Amino acid sequence: MIVQLRRVLALAGAGLLTLVSACESQKPKYEGPYAAEVAQAVPMIEKAVGLKFKTPPKIETRSKEQVREFVTKQFTDSLAKHDIAGQEAAYKRLGMIPDTLKLQPFLTSLLEEQIVGYYDPHTKVLYVVDGSPKDMAQLTITHELVHALQDQYISLDSVQKIRDDNDRLSAAQSVFEGQAVYEQISIMLGGSNIAINLPGGWDRIREMIRENQSSMPIFAAAPKVIQETLIFPYLSGAEFYR
């Protein structure tokens, strides 16, 4: 898969899970939006991952319009346009997408549907979309804070800038997303891996993630190759990390 597309699809992690948090609330010690959610998640993430935040994570809100601008911007530089045009041509030649499908606007709409929040390694800020349901915002914060912690030890920005080596980029993205998904699930289960490790437990969680994705209209209408490209780093990455 193309470098630029994989980089943008990495932003969609918050839309992958709808499990209910069993974590106990803690006294907030952070300021700004979602201070209570951040204060609750940080110590659990540090315990699960085994690393401490070097600096407090930053979190801000973004309007849906700002998210659309951000997503659109990822496709507008000359290299991105060239990559997407080539990928679209290859998909059509192989019969993987309809001849009438325009990949760039479709991906923009798909990502808008998926994104509840994202961590930007360039600004070092976790962004949550205004008006997001509370449960989804909590899941987003937990997942993306894992990325914020990863970024304090390994530069995620440098990984996202990998060029001309899609296999390397895909492997790195799957490791980062896989850890975030797996630790998020563990935290949602109260810090226990019992349900994950029970016979059939992990398979059921994978099914739940796929079912949730399929409930989203644009994702459900997407060609199979786009669906699998979107979901691969999360499911297969978590399987590897497990």
Model features per residue range: what roles?
Residues 24-26:
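Bacterial signal peptide processing site
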Residues 179, 188-190, 210-242:
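Active-site-proximal alpha-helical
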Residues 19-22:
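C-terminal motif of bacterial Sec signal peptides marking the signal peptidase cleavage site
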Residues 69-82, 102-123:
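Catalytic zinc-binding patch centered on the HExxH motif and its immediate surroundings
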Residues 45, 139-156, 180-181:
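Active-site recognition of the HExxH zinc-binding catalytic motif
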Residues 126-141, 171-172:
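Short pre-active-site segment immediately N-terminal to the catalytic Zn-binding motif
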Residues 55-74, 163-167, 198-207:
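Acidic helix-start/capping segments at beta-turn-to-alpha-helix junctions
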Residues 151-157, 161-209:
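Post-HExxH zinc-binding segment in Zn-dependent metallohydrolases
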